[in-house]
């Protein structure tokens, strides 16, 4: 991330400041003690292997036990330093239920025992993997953590090489092991409510238990990919309750976990036909809650990616359930502030719908125009991108239904003073299929878009936009020169009328101002004749304005 370097630099400066202040104190307090503390030797496991040297687990120095009074009153210099320091986001752990008995014994590998003992050994290793460790303290249970990691890796190797070794009797133990390790309450979000995560600046909060967690996910995925998987037996354990708990985890801030969850849920959707309708309905409810209640959920992009592949497999004609999902769920998702975080996935799903059934084109385009951003230029560029993607798969007959509202919106975007919005709208005319549709309907389109093109060609501040507008005007001139001249003449006449109306309006306001000044000066005399004369002039002016 771009911001991480600046974060580390600012943090380093604060640490250097603290070190320099501590050096003076240490010289006074330790001048009488010239001996150095002996270095701690790394701890070893019962087999004699060194654990303290591993990078994943760090040792924590022991506290001396002495109470030292500390002055916590901040000085002015401390306040200045704290204002300029931006802390680096640390790894966080979910609220795991830590196992009480964490003393594990290393079991032999599957390659070291006969094949007829693999089943019992797999059960023992699965039981070991149900032990949950505390990764918030990296100095505890180092040996047990390593034993569990090896057991998970052995199970992965077994199911990868000998898929038939995992029989139906192991299904409950496998699902239980996955549930114990994965299903847990997630920590509160790092960002305050309503704040959108910046992918370039913000560091995601990573799960500290990932050394074990990713192996659990990997094993479970390989379990689903096994050709010997009996879904009729497994569906007893992979049920609706399991799916609900799995969907909750999509709110994890760790992108690595969300990626595993996406693949896991997709495998379940493909394997368990009886759960498909429930999965779609549950995702719909989650989206509705996101759109209409809190707009706080981290896994929208991953869920939309799953739905993109599901939409791709819809049979024709589309069911009413799928059309309702499009109109009430997928299109309203565009109004969320966090649209940039899941834009590629939702755009793919929308295009898939239009490509599957062209009859939904009008509803999709009008829905996007309804939620069109008014003040967010970067979001408006995304909408323009999506509209062009839809046009590329649009039937010419459907284009006729939406061309008028669409080109009114394009004219507004072309007139935008934000050069990125104007540039993106003008790039539509580099699309050959779009130009072909314009050529066939130029008599309707040109009168709508010509005023915006003409005004921008005369007044836009950006030279690139000015050049692109001139190219578009030349394109229309080449398509139909006579129509172009006619529209130009009509627009020139309308501009002349507006100028005349503006002159008349200014003259009338001048008359009103003069009457007001005259009235203010003469009302003091309270002359009834003057007041009557002023009233008559105002009535005459009102009649002239009404008659045009």
From Swiss-Prot:
Compositionally biased intervals (Basic residues): 1-10
Any single GO BP term: meiotic sister chromatid cohesion
Broad class of where this protein is predominantly found: cytoplasm
Region entry Disordered, spans: 1-75
Modified residues (Phosphoserine): 99, 109, 542
UniProt xrefs under PANTHER family: SERINE/THREONINE PROTEIN PHOSPHATASE 2A PP2A REGULATORY SUBUNIT B, SERINE_THREONINE-PROTEIN PHOSPHATASE 2A 56 KDA REGULATORY SUBUNIT DELTA 1 ISOFORM
Subunit description: PP2A consists of a common heterodimeric core enzyme, composed of a 36 kDa catalytic subunit (subunit C) and a 65 kDa constant regulatory subunit (PR65 or subunit A), that associates with a variety of regulatory subunits. Proteins that associate with the core dimer include three families of regulatory subunits B (the R2/B/PR55/B55, R3/B''/PR72/PR130/PR59 and R5/B'/B56 families), the 48 kDa variable regulatory subunit, viral proteins, and cell signaling molecules.
Cited function: The B regulatory subunit might modulate substrate selectivity and catalytic activity, and might also direct the localization of the catalytic enzyme to a particular subcellular compartment. Has a role in cell shape control and septum formation.
Name assigned to this protein: Serine/threonine-protein phosphatase 2A 56 kDa regulatory subunit delta 1 isoform
Species in which this protein is naturally found: Schizosaccharomyces pombe (strain 972 / ATCC 24843)
């Amino acid at each position: 991330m771009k911001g991480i370097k600046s974060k580390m630099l600012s943090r380093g400066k604060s640490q250097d400041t603290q070190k320099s202040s501590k050096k003076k104190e240490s010289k006074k307090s330790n001048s009488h003690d010239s001996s150095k503390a002996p270095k701690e030797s790394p701890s070893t496991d019962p087999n004699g292997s060194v654990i303290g040297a591993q990078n994943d687990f760090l040792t924590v120095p022991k506290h001396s036990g002495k109470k030292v009074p500390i002055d916590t009153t901040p000085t002015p210099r401390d306040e200045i330093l704290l204002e300029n320091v931006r802390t680096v986001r640390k790894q966080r752990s979910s609220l795991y239920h830590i196992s009480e008995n964490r003393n594990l014994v290393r079991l032999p590998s599957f390659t070291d025992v006969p094949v007829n003992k693999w089943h019992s050994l797999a059960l023992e290793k699965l039981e070991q993997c149900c032990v949950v460790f505390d990764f918030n303290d990296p100095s505890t249970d180092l040996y047990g953590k390593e034993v569990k990691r090896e057991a998970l890796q052995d199970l992965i190797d077994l199911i990868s090489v000998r898929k038939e070794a995992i029989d139906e009797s192991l299904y409950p133990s496998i699902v239980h092991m996955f549930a114990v390790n994965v299903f847990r309450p997630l920590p509160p979000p790092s960002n305050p409510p309503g704040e959108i995560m910046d992918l370039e600046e913000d560091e995601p909060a990573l799960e500290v238990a990932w050394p074990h967690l990713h192996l659990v996910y990997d094993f479970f995925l390989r379990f689903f990919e096994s050709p010997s998987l009996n879904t009729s037996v497994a569906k007893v354990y992979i049920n609706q309750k399991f799916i609900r708990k799995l969907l909750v985890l999509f709110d994890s801030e760790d992108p690595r976990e969300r990626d595993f969850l996406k693949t896991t849920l997709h495998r379940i959707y493909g394997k368990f036909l009886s759960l498909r309708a429930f999965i779609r309905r549950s995702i719909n409810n989650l989206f509705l809650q996101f759109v209409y209640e809190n707009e706080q959920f981290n896994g929208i992009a991953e869920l939309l990616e799953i739905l993109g592949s599901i939409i791709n497999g819809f049979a024709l004609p589309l069911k009413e359930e799928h059309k309702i999902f499009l109109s009430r769920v997928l299109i309203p998702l565009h109004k969320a502030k966090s649209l940039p975080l899941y834009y590629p996935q939702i755009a793919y799903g929308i295009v898939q719908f239009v490509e599957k059934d062209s009859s939904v084109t009008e509803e999709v385009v009008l829905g996007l125009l309804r939620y069109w951003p008014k003040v967010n230029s970067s979001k408006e560029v995304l909408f323009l991108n999506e509209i062009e993607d839809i046009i590329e798969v649009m039937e010419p007959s459907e284009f006729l239904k939406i061309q008028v509202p669409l080109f009114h919106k394009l004219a507004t975007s072309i007139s935008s003073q934000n050069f990125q919005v104007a540039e993106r709208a003008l790039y539509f005319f580099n699309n050959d299929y779009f130009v072909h549709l314009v050529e066939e309907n130029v008599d309707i389109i040109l009168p709508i878009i010509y005023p915006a093109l003409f005004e921008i060609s005369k007044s836009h501040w950006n030279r690139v936009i000015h050049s692109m507008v001139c190219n578009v005007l030349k394109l229309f001139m080449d398509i139909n020169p006579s129509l172009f001249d006619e529209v130009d003449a009509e627009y020139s006449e309308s501009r002349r009328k507006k100028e005349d109306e503006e002159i008349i309006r200014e003259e009338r306001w001048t008359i009103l101002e003069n009457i007001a000044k005259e009235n203010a000066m003469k009302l003091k005399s309270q002359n009834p004749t003057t007041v009557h004369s002023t009233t008559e002039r105002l009535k005459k002016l009102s009649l002239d304005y009404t008659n045009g």
